[in-house]
Amino acid sequence: MNQDRETLVFNKITKTFQFGRQTVTLETGEIARQASGSVVVSVDDTVVMVSVVGGKNVKPGQDFFPLTVDYLERTYAAGKIPGGFFKREGKQSEKEVLTSRLIDRPIRPLFPEGFYHDVQIVATVLSLNPEVDSDIPAMIGASAALAISGLPFAGPIGAARVGYANGEYILNPTKTELQTSQMDLVVAGTSRAVLMVESEAKELPEAVMLGAVVFGHEQMQAAIKAINELADEVNPVMFDWAAPAKDEALIAQIRGIAGEKLAEAFRLRQKQARTVAINEAWDAVKAGLINEETDTLKANEIKGIFKSLEAEIVRGQILAGEARIDGRDTRTVRPISIRNNVLPRTHGSALFTRGETQALVVATLGTKQDEQIIDALAGEYTERFMLHYNFPPYSTGEAGRMGPPKRREIGHGRLAKRALVAVLPPEDEFGYSMRVVSEITESNGSSSMASVCGGCLSLLSAGVPLKAHVAGIAMGLILEGNRFAVLTDILGDEDHLGDMDFKVAGTAAGVTALQMDIKIQGITKEIMQVALEQAKEGRLHILGLMKEAVDGPQELSAHAPRLYVMKINPEKIREVIGKGGETIRSITKDTGCEINIEEDGTITIASVSSEGAEAAKKRIEEITVEVEVGKVYEGTVVKILDNNVGAIVSILPGKDGLVHISQIANERIKNVSDYLKEGQVVKVKAIEMDDRGRIRLSIKALLEEEAKTAQATADAFGLKTQ
């Protein structure tokens, strides 16, 4: 029976646009069609598929927006098979976590207040050109997928990477170009406003950083235009959702119960006392408006109104020119305390306290073997500098679960690392690997910037010759209509209730890291300029205090390893390592040193003990010394050859030579064992070395030389020799 063959037809829509020197293609309608929105982004052989799914119903009792973003790298994208026993991708790498956050941050504030449906964004890297980072395509793809999903999303957004070299900005620099760039900045925003900035730089002026943000925002308009065209052509069915109407009567009730109490609470300068007073105000609201018959949705609505009232009061006080929550004006940095070398056995340590935020930061020096190996999709590499940030629950006076680092901890650690990388000494001047760990012991805002300050101080404590001191500060913003206030060194409450979180780190010469998250649209270039200049003022103040506490690098700790560098002939590396690593293991075990050997013959010996290092150096020198023909050596007979050909004599570690039977004595001998025994110490002369490195030794040659010397002496004195 014949059947007509059916052909599956895809409603495929494609948009292509020029993005600087790169051509970007957006495709939808062929892959992942059951998702709310799905877009495949292609940029010079880098291909990322991004899907968006919006939940149709809200979970009972849901009182927050449950957005999840996962960026996933598949090893097949780079033509690789995963390592390890299971041969499949496992938990997210640090790069995957950081890129997930990069996508999340500019998208989250564009969903409307009160929208509590589940939204999941999954970005999967399908193909990777090592020169084109997949993060910008993933961000553009997420924006495009949301734009065609029908979800209530106030986008689209665009994203761009900006480099800076020879006084010019570079749009979407390649991996190779970034190696010589003075800046690596990622900016995201809508057609009207910037929403997010993430960057590191090599001590660049504030004006250059601001110019990069503006340049990136201008250039990303090409992506926004293409996404809008794609959405128009797709013409998605809009999500059936409307913002809940405000209950003005309920708002008035809550204001009447808690308004004055909250206003008084936010005049209390100490965080814990303020928290108690806010909780008392909330208890009064609960007692008056919530009972056993109140359903969860109504309870959540009441709680939301209470939180909005908190924000309204704090923001109003600041814009009215009143003192901030802790009594400061808008430009003052909280009191700072610095203690260095606080831990006796660590290589370097510092306790940095700014108001109610405190970081105990520890630096550890290691060797080449301690470097972090990164098995990246674009290729394996190592990092000599690591910074890890820990945020335990006790830092905010809470009890909670301890476990592996969360996304926030990884992100904060990365920001602090970006801030310090620019001032690290080059490897050829300071051969150590370095690990900094920031333990946040108290937190009330800006703990990542405390980690920058403490990290710098701990590295100086460890003796690391930094190019300059680095300090960091977090800025905030309150914006209502045409009125705004930029806040220096924000508290945790000011971060939650404000419109911007703007973190700047750098030296006295310029910016080394900048991170900005904006929760509203309408932040102008002028506001960003004011924030940057005010941040510089605060940063210079902190740098002055840091320099007073620790002027420069201190001496290496007695507990830190010392590095000794020597050079050998690269052809001798095999001899130092030995068969199966036997020789090098023996040296490290006997001397207690760590030894690293480079391909060019550079050997680095790391040891806390100078005696151990000298012993290791001597062993290596003995192994690598060249045998000289004509030179006399004292050696040990290690073997009498079975065929009576001669004996093997060890003259240097790893250097054996043959004494042929004819080279043992002047007279003809029948048995080698009549003259030599294993373990016997003899003097030999190196008489020949062939092209394979085999050494021929002679005892006879020395006997002949001794005879000639004796004859010459006798002749000089007129004596007869027998």
Swiss-Prot record:
EC number: 2.7.7.8
Binding residues annotated for Mg(2+), in chain numbering: 495, 501
Alphabetized Pfam families for the sequence: KH_1 (PF00013), PNPase (PF03726), RNase_PH (PF01138), RNase_PH_C (PF03725), S1 (PF00575)
Alphabetized InterPro entries for the sequence: ExoRNase_PH_dom1 (IPR001247), ExoRNase_PH_dom2 (IPR015847), ExoRNase_PH_dom2_sf (IPR036345), KH_dom (IPR004087), KH_dom_type_1 (IPR004088), KH_dom_type_1_sf (IPR036612), NA-bd_OB-fold (IPR012340), PNPase (IPR012162)
Major location category of this protein: cytoplasm
Chain ranges of the KH domain: 561-620
UniProtKB keywords: Cytoplasm, Magnesium, Metal-binding, Nucleotidyltransferase, RNA-binding, Transferase
UniProt GO MF annotations: 3'-5'-RNA exonuclease activity; magnesium ion binding; polyribonucleotide nucleotidyltransferase activity; RNA binding
Compartment(s) of residence: Cytoplasm
Stretches that traverse the bilayer: none
Keyword RNA-binding included in the entry's annotation: yes
Ranges where the S1 motif domain occurs: 630-700
Cofactor needs: Mg(2+)
SMART domains: KH (SM00322), S1 (SM00316)
GO BP term, pick one: RNA processing
Reactions performed catalytically: RNA(n+1) + phosphate = RNA(n) + a ribonucleoside 5'-diphosphate
Similarity remark: Belongs to the polyribonucleotide nucleotidyltransferase family.
Function, as annotated: Involved in mRNA degradation. Catalyzes the phosphorolysis of single-stranded polyribonucleotides processively in the 3'- to 5'-direction.
NCBIfam families: polynuc_phos, PRK11824.1
HAMAP family: PNPase
Protein name, UniProt field: Polyribonucleotide nucleotidyltransferase
Native organism: Chromobacterium violaceum (strain ATCC 12472 / DSM 30191 / JCM 1249 / CCUG 213 / NBRC 12614 / NCIMB 9131 / NCTC 9757 / MK)
Gene name linked to the record: pnp
